[in-house]
């Protein structure tokens, strides 16, 4: 009797532990899925869960498979509820390509290209050795091209210079605007087939990153185009090596502290920068708005959610 009672108690403890583990995994998974709704300046943990969402997704799949094999109907109902709740965010993270919907004729359509060119690969452009990035942009067929990190070199043998950029692309894009934001930091450029009526830097708190708002006359209609390059995490190879070493050593506390110290300031910067851009969009009223660029964040991030609030995702 004592042995049977002990077995019963052990079984109950195991079930409780499994339930607690399931709730912890599912809770973290849902918090990561909806992390974009929580400002990092108020609570930073959801931002980290959103960043590591793929790992949480794998864990949630594992928990679901376990309860399928155990065939516990109550736990399976819980899993079904979790998947149903997270479905909208899964479609944000993994957008499904549906049949192309035509919103008008070919003449009415607008093709946008957003490209972080990383200083055009620091490679020059000549007739005998053309720059691959410039070639891609020229052949893209885009009506408007938003470029981030469009740093132009002073030496034509060390990279793309302003004169080369304009002369090579002028036939396709007669309207070109290049602005170095935040005291000469990252360079943002807009190449357009339509007249650029105004270009103004958006004052974002950052050392090198930034954003620019353009008013473009597209077929007689003014459109606000915002080219965004949000704060970078500035992760170096040595950082990755340190994190990997801490993970291998099983030093979870030091790994957590290292990640928090490195990533938290950027998450908070994204929060502030996204709010500024959101307010600008709202102040524009009911006019046409296009936002694109390098957000340096995930599709589930607060930055993506806040900037995109009230807009339609093109993906």
Residue ranges and their predicted role:
Residues 44, 128, 132, 272, ...:
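Short, conserved clusters of charged catalytic residues that mark active-site
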Residues 48, 190, 313:
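Conserved beta-strand positions that form and line the central face of beta-propeller blades
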Residues 238-315:
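Metal-dependent phosphoesterases centered on the DNase I-like endonuclease/exonuclease/phosphatase
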Residues 12, 23, 30, 37, ...:
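Enzyme catalytic cores with a strong preference for nitrogen-chemistry domains
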Residues 112-113, 146, 291:
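Residue-level marker for buried hydrophobic side chains located in beta-strands
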Residues 69-70, 138, 282-285:
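Residue-level signal for alpha-helix termini/capping positions
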Residues 2-106:
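N-terminal membrane-anchoring alpha-helices
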Residues 77, 83-109, 119, 124-126, ...:
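Structured beta-strand-rich core segments of catalytic domains in phosphoester-bond hydrolases
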């Amino acid at each position: 009797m004592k042995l049977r009672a002990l077995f019963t108690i052990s079984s109950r403890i195991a079930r409780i532990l499994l339930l607690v583990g399931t709730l912890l995994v599912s809770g973290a998974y849902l918090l990561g899925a909806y992390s974009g709704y929580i400002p990092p300046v108020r609570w930073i943990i959801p931002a980290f869960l959103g960043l590591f969402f793929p790992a949480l997704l794998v864990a949630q799949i594992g928990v679901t498979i376990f309860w399928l094999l155990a065939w516990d109907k109550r736990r399976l109902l819980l899993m079904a509820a979790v998947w149903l709740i997270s479905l909208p965010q899964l479609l944000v993270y993994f957008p499904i390509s549906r049949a192309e919907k035509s919103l008008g004729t070919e003449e009415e359509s607008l093709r946008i290209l957003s490209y972080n060119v990383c200083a055009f690969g620091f490679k020059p452009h000549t007739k005998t050795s053309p720059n691959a990035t410039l070639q891609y942009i020229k052949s893209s067929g885009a009506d408007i091209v938003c470029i981030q990190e469009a740093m132009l070199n002073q030496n034509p043998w060390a990279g793309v210079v302003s004169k080369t950029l304009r002369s090579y692309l002028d036939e396709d894009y007669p309207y070109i605007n290049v602005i170095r934001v935040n005291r000469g930091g990252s360079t943002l450029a807009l190449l357009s087939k339509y007249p650029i009526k105004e270009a103004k830097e958006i004052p974002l708190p950052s050392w090198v990153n930034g954003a620019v708002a353009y008013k473009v006359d597209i077929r007689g209609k003014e459109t606000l185009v915002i080219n965004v390059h949000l704060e970078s995490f500035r992760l170096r190879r040595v950082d990755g090596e340190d994190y990997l070493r801490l993970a291998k050593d099983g030093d979870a506390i030091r790994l957590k502290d290292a990640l928090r110290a490195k990533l938290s300031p950027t998450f908070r910067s994204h929060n502030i920068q996204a709010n500024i851009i959101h307010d600008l969009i709202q102040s524009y009223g009911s006019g046409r708005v296009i936002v694109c660029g390098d957000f340096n964040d995930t599709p589930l991030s607060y930055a993506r959610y806040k900037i995109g609030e009230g807009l339609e995702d093109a993906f």
